[in-house]
């Protein structure tokens, strides 16, 4: 790598390569410095809109020769500053690489470009009898979901991105293009490079193609909602449902604070208490059996008002409330900013971790609703702060640190599905110890000049 060239020189070269699909317009740059996270705007120097893998490879080579950082960008829905251009550089926006390349219906897999969103993918799959179930809530891009090892509401039944990504096409820091695997459902051939790039947040290479498992659309779907007097009762119900081998598709927890926000935001009348939202997939008979079994377990744990939602309209209304928890939470404190964080613990420790975290937030005076994918021990907290009060930001940071320390002490993780990004760098060594040095060795081997999404996962001295 030579010395970093000026932005104007590189912009001219990129314009010569891809024309107006290279932009230095201030509005475009600012748009790509933002995300759903609470971090300040960190825009790139240039934004490019590639259309093919070859274009990505050519631009990566040009960036490498110019010493210019490379930052992949999907839908801008990340929550830990994962796509922030902390060192400037060139942002690769994949909005034009948003196609389904191949659908293998018999094999139940698809090959897609990274810019397609999960909703776009499922719209393309309509009519095939297949669907892609990973649902992080936001309409995230498949490339972004892959890069952050995303999860979501149906992970308890269908797994996370690491379970559903079969193979990748990746452009490395030197412009080489590799395929990490074939389409076979299993392989013992060499290192598992696919898993290595899933969750790497663009720090090892740029993903240009993703092969995904897809699943049969269930014959029948039913949903249900049930409230509880305590978080413990709600979590114990969820654990009992899982341990009873009921193949629940979703089991989501909203605490009393979040239910208050949901009612106000969506004009609903739910009981403002810890509440479980369920969804069941299968045949008509099996769905009815699953729901009845879950209802009996909820009753054993003092559940209130177990209500079914069988009609599509009723299910949509129920899950619309769950999917809008960010905006419902923000409505609890108008004008506030949400510091969103997540942890994941073994489900046997979930009730303890949730209860202690709820108590911690309350004792420190924070409005901080909680929502969790309790089937796999993952929960999120939205810490609402006044952006004009630095002491609140510091308090939120301390609250998050205690939440993470609590999870790690319970043999959990500092992030269940948001990734490390900028926000969790300080906790990675606490969780993984000397394994972080191995990660750094891999990073150095694949990206010796440190140009691939710098400042993410590992500290670079630049902080938001």
Feature annotation, model-predicted:
Residues 1-464:
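Noncatalytic alpha-helical scaffold of FAD-dependent oxidoreductases
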């Amino acid at each position: 790598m030579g010395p970093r060239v000026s932005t104007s020189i590189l912009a001219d070269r990129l314009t010569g390569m891809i024309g107006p699909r290279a932009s230095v317009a201030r509005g475009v740059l600012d748009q790509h410095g933002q995300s759903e996270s609470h971090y300040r705007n960190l825009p790139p120097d240039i934004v490019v809109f590639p259309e093919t893998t070859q274009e990505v490879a050519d631009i990566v080579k040009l960036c490498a020769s110019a010493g210019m950082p490379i930052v992949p960008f999907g839908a801008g829905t990340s929550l830990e500053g994962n796509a922030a251009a902390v060192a400037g550089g060139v942002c690769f926006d994949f909005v034009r690489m948003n196609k389904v390349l191949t659908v293998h219906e018999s094999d139940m897999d698809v090959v897609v470009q990274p810019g397609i969103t999960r909703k776009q993918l499922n719209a393309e799959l309509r009519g095939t009898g297949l669907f892609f179930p990973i649902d992080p809530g936001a309409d995230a891009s498949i490339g972004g979901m892959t890069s952050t090892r995303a999860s979501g509401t149906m992970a308890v039944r269908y797994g996370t991105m690491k379970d559903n990504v079969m193979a990748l096409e990746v452009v490395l820091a030197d412009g080489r293009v590799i395929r990490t695997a074939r389409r076979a459902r299993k392989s013992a051939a060499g290192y598992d490079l696919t898993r290595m790039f899933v969750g790497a947040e663009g720090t090892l290479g740029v993903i240009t193609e993703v092969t995904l498992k897809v699943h049969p659309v269930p014959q029948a779907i039913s949903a249900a909602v049930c409230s509880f007097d305590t978080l413990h009762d709600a979590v114990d119900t969820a654990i009992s449902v899982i341990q009873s081998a009921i193949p629940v598709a979703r089991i989501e927890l909203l605490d009393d604070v979040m239910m208050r926000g949901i009612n106000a935001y969506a004009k609903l009348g739910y009981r403002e208490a810890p509440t479980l939202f369920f969804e069941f997939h299968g045949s008509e008979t099996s769905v009815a059996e699953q729901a009845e079994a879950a209802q009996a377990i909820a009753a054993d744990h003092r559940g209130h008002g177990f209500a079914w939602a069988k009609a599509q309209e009723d299910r949509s209304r129920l899950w619309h409330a769950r999917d809008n928890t960010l905006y419902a939470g923000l409505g609890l404190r108008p004008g506030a900013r949400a510091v969103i964080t997540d942890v994941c613990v073994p489900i046997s420790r979930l009730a303890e971790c949730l209860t202690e975290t709820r108590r911690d937030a309350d004792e420190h005076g924070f409005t901080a609703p909680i929502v969790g994918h309790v089937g796999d021990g993952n929960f999120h907290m939205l810490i609402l702060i006044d952006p004009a009060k630095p002491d609140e930001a510091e308090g939120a940071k301390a609250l998050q640190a205690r939440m993470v320390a609590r999870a790690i002490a319970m043999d959990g993780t500092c992030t269940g599905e948001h990734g490390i990004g900028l926000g969790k760098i300080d906790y990675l060594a606490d969780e993984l110890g000397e394994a972080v040095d191995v990660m750094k060795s891999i990073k150095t081997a694949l990206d010796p000049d440190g140009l691939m999404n710098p400042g993410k996962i590992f500290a670079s001295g630049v902080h938001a």
